[in-house]
């Protein structure tokens, strides 16, 4: 409880990845574990703008990680991971153990772990200022930076009358007794099944039957029409504004329905709530046509709001991760949103532009830096990265915010392209 309200306390994705890596190794999936460790190193390199040796750091982290798994503490964590019982305290202990074993990992681990929480607190605060334009006060989330002794965590207020947006968008396509998580798990089992999976033959047969039922064209058409009817009747206010503002703040894979909620507003219209805003990852202003997969940027949407529907629903913006293994369902969801909400995208882009035009960027960057000041009392913690590196990343993020804040303001008040 914080301020008399129930909150969910979380650590960031980097520590979560350490826990996931332990779980992968407990299942014998060493390559998957190495991949997750690589994500952490990649995050450090991104935040420090290449100022670390990625290959050497990856090797150090991998060696320290597997050495940790051979310790009594590591074996204990692996046993807990087998049953999905790892908690925040556990992943923090894994982090501490790795740094204690190899102090050279203090900065490469500490920077992404620290900025997981700083960036969430700062970016969520910014997005909340926009969400005040269409959400009632009790539906605006928060992400408060917590600094218990020698640690940094995020506390997010629970919104009990909201439901996950991914559940809301997909339920019309699923049998009543099947959750989205169960459907995704079935798809994952089918995809990863070996040709001679005789031991799981019955389970796989059930999974394939479920997927065939979901992907049946009749079911897909019926689900799409049900979603179209719901959206036309009750709307989905804030969807495009949420997608756009998170895009301007540099989000990538976290930009999608699995990081949003939906609630019924006082006017009985559905409202989207953005939660777990990571932010400050990439400069996503420009399109990236040379990527292996084309990626839209936010610049053209700001300059030409009429393009918003196509751009913001493109898979390079609205992630399909929420429907992993259910591509046909995602395709129908996109079609339904496009048909039902085609007149909503452009006005919501204008709302985001007006919000940026009124944004006090200097105050916003000062607020971002103040989050770093909250952590000065933790400088003696063994995992904390060097203060100079923390200031370097704060300056990077402030620069990103300054750049984003300037362009939309020009587009609102200046000549139109």
How should each PLM-predicted stretch be described?
Residues 42, 46-49, 53-54, 121, ...:
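Conserved kinase catalytic-core segment
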Residues 267-415:
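C-terminal catalytic region of ATP-dependent kinase domains
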Residues 32-37, 115-119, 227-236, 246-247, ...:
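Conserved aromatic-histidine-acidic binding/catalytic patches
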Residues 166-181, 228, 295-309:
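A recognition module on extended beta-rich or small alphabeta surfaces enriched in W/G with H and D/E
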Residues 18, 61-65, 70-78, 86-91, ...:
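Short amphipathic alpha-helical segments that mediate assembly, nucleic-acid/protein binding
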Residues 1-191, 251:
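Conserved ATP-binding subdomain of kinase catalytic cores across diverse folds
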């Amino acid at each position: 409880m914080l301020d008399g309200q129930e909150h969910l306390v979380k650590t960031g994705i980097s520590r979560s990845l350490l826990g996931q890596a332990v779980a992968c190794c407990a299942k014998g999936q060493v390559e998957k574990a190495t991949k997750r460790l690589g994500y952490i190193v990649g995050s450090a390199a991104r935040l420090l703008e290449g100022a670390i040796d990625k290959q050497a750091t990856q090797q150090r982290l991998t060696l320290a990680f597997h050495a940790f798994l051979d310790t009594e503490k590591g074996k204990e964590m692996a046993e807990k991971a087998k049953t999905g019982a790892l908690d925040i305290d556990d992943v923090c202990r894994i982090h501490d153990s790795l740094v204690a074993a190899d102090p050279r990992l203090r900065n490469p681990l500490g920077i992404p772990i620290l900025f997981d929480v700083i960036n969430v607190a700062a970016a969520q605060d910014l997005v909340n200022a926009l969400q005040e334009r269409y959400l009632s006060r009790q539906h605006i989330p928060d992400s408060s930076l917590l600094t218990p002794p020698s640690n940094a965590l995020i506390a997010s207020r629970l919104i009990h009358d909201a439901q996950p947006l991914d559940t809301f968008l997909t339920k019309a396509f699923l049998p009543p007794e099947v959750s989205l998580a169960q459907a995704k798990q079935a798809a994952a089992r089918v995809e990863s099944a070996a040709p001679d999976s005789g031991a799981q033959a019955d389970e796989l047969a059930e999974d394939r039957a479920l997927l065939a039922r979901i992907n049946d064209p009749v079911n897909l058409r019926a689900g799409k029409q049900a979603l179209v009817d719901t959206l036309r009747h009750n709307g989905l206010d804030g969807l495009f504004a949420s997608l756009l503002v998170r895009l301007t703040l540099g989000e990538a894979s976290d930009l999608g329905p699995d990081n949003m909620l939906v609630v019924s507003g006082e006017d009985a219209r559905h409202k989207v709530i953005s939660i777990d805003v990571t932010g400050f990852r990439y400069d996503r202003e420009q399109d990236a046509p040379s990527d292996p997969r084309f990626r839209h940027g936010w610049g053209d949407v700001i300059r030409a709001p009429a393009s918003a529907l196509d751009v913001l629903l493109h898979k390079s913006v609205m992630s399909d991760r929420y429907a992993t293994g259910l591509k046909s369902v995602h395709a129908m969801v996109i079609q339904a949103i496009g048909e039902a909400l085609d007149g909503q995208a452009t006005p919501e882009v204008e709302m985001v532009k007006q919000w940026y035009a009124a944004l006090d960027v200097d105050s916003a960057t000062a607020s971002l830096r103040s989050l770093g000041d909250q952590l000065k009392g933790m400088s003696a913690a063994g995992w904390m990265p060097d203060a100079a590196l923390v200031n370097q990343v704060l300056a990077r993020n402030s620069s990103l915010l300054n750049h984003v804040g300037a362009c939309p303001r020009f587009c609102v008040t200046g000549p139109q392209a």
